């Protein structure tokens, strides 16, 4: 068995993680107390054509028949963890995997990174115990926001320890990136830059989403006038469900955890990917509208479907692209859809990389949580792509960082937690280089020029 352990950190990471596990349980026929719904495995076997035990990669099955998520939830203060402990799925998780401190990190990266050594050790101990229940650990899926102190600082400290202890295991990271128009804290640009710099060597691939993009999707495509974090997390969870479906269900063209960085990351530093999901439709619209595989594929490349805000994606080029299809989809239909995209020349790839699409198909259709604003459909798809337009994402946060750091605003809060001012300049320089890297990768002579220089 190739197990995956998910680690949910901070308020955003824990709330998103809880939504993901709610959806996973529905998809696998597991009730909120961890018991399996009668005949749920047989139903999955009919769809996949065999005995479906792949879900054990994400769930540990106990001797009493209960299924426990291979998941750790950690926050520096108890509010969100207490909500999970008293919520509908309180009986699902292992009690020792719901970890919290007593005081939050005050939206301060430095405090989150260095101020919680006992909590860090407790979390690493829980991870160690979780790995001992694995027969062949693939790696880790980490959920966090980089705007807050815990999500940025504590995540960086934890990933440093994970990289040291589990060096050869794959580490994937789903990051909620700061949105200037939906900011929850003025120092978010500091935390985002410091976290990205600190995590650069510790994560193999990062999936980027921001609340502003999800907010717009909820408004335009679902008609939710004032979306809450509840709506946003449900939508992100649906995308994460599609990304992990090949790990949790038996099916054709399965994607292994290690294949994400292999197929998405051309160079170790440039490991930041954007996501899109389709279709996002209301239950009323789903009854009237069924997209073909060709239409589904085309909608993935619509800028309005992207879950990260780019000023103009058409100014950049694709370096790599993974598409995960679910439900009533055949390999032939996918091949025809991809061929159609290539012929239209509307999806530009960099000249130094072959125009290749990594496609995965899973026959298990997506599931909608009862009462949610979006509907489950017969077929759906999710795209993850490494695109040179990511330079625009880093440019925005770098500019906002500079506006504050030029006046040394709020820097004393970080210095008071043990940081030095030069750590800000080092991190900012690193993000500038990352921004330039992504911009230069759009130039078709990038690799040729580098190889000529090397010779």
Swiss-Prot record:
It comes from the Eukaryota. CDD domains: alpha_tubulin. Mg(2+) binds at residue 77. Its cofactor is Mg(2+). The active site is at residue 259. It is found in: Cytoplasm, Cytoskeleton. It catalyses: GTP + H2O = GDP + phosphate + H(+). Pfam families: Tubulin, Tubulin_C. Its EC number is 3.6.5.-. GTP binds at residues 11, 77, 145, 149-150, 184, 211, 233. One of its GO terms (molecular function) is GTP binding. GO terms for biological process: microtubule cytoskeleton organization; mitotic cell cycle. GO terms for cellular component: cytoplasm; microtubule. It is an enzyme of class 3 (hydrolase). The keyword Cell inner membrane does not apply. Its main location: cytoplasm. Belongs to the tubulin family. PANTHER family: TUBULIN. Tubulin is the major constituent of microtubules, a cylinder consisting of laterally associated linear protofilaments composed of alpha- and beta-tubulin heterodimers. Microtubules grow by the addition of GTP-tubulin dimers to the microtubule end, where a stabilizing cap forms. Below the cap, tubulin dimers are in GDP-bound state, owing to GTPase activity of alpha-tubulin. Dimer of alpha and beta chains. A typical microtubule is a hollow water-filled tube with an outer diameter of 25 nm and an inner diameter of 15 nM. Alpha-beta heterodimers associate head-to-tail to form protofilaments running lengthwise along the microtubule wall with the beta-tubulin subunit facing the microtubule plus end conferring a structural polarity. Microtubules usually have 13 protofilaments but different protofilament numbers can be found in some organisms and specialized cells. This is Tubulin alpha chain. The gene is A-TUB.
């Amino acid at each position: 068995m190739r197990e995956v352990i998910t680690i949910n950190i901070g308020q955003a990471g824990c709330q998103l993680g809880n939504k993901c596990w709610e959806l996973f349980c529905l998809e696998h026929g597991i009730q909120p107390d961890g018991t399996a719904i009668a005949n749920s495995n047989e139903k999955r076997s009919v769809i996949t054509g065999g005995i479906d035990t792949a879900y054990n990669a994400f769930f540990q099955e106990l001797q009493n028949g209960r299924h426990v998520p291979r998941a750790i939830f950690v926050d520096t203060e108890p509010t969100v963890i207490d909500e999970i402990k008293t919520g509908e799925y309180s009986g699902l998780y292992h009690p020792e995997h719901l970890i919290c401190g007593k005081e939050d990190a005050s939206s301060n990266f430095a405090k989150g990174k260095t101020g919680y050594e006992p909590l860090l050790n407790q979390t690493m101990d829980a991870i160690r115990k979780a790995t001992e229940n694995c027969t062949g650990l693939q790696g880790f899926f980490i959920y966090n926001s980089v705007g807050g102190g815990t999500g940025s600082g504590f995540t960086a400290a934890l990933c440093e320890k994970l990289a040291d202890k589990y060096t050869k295991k794959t580490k994937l990271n789903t990051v909620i990136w700061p949105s200037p128009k939906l900011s929850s804290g003025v120092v978010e640009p500091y935390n985002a830059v410091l976290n990205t710099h600190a995590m650069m060597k510790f994560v193999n691939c990062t999936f980027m989403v921001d609340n502003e993009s999800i907010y717009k999707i909820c408004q335009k495509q679902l008609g939710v006038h004032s979306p809450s974090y509840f709506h946003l997390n449900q939508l992100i969870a649906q995308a994460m469900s599609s990304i992990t479906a090949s790990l949790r269900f038996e099916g054709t063209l399965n994607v292994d955890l290690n294949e994400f960085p292999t197929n998405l990351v051309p160079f170790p530093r440039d490991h930041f990917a954007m996501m899109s999901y389709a279709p996002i439709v209301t239950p009323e619209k789903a009854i009237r509208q069924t997209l073909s595989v060709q239409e589904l594929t085309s909608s993935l490349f619509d800028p309005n479907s992207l879950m990260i805000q780019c000023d103009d994606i058409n100014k950049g080029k694709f370096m790599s692209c993974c598409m995960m299809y679910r439900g009533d989809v055949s390999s032939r239909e996918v091949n025809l859809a991809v061929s159609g995209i290539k012929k239209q020349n509307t999806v530009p790839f960099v000249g130094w990389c072959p125009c290749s699409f990594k496609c995965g198909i899973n026959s298990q259709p997506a599931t909608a949580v009862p009462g949610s604003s979006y509907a489950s459909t017969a077929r759906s798809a999710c795209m993850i792509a490494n695109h040179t337009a990511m330079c625009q994402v880093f440019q925005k946060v770098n500019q906002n960082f500079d506006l504050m750091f030029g006046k040394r605003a709020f820097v004393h809060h970080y210095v008071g937690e043990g940081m030095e001012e030069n750590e800000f300049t080092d991190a900012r320089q690193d993000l500038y280089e990352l921004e330039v890297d992504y911009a230069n990768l759009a130039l078709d002579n990038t690799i040729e020029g580098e190889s000529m220089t090397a010779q």
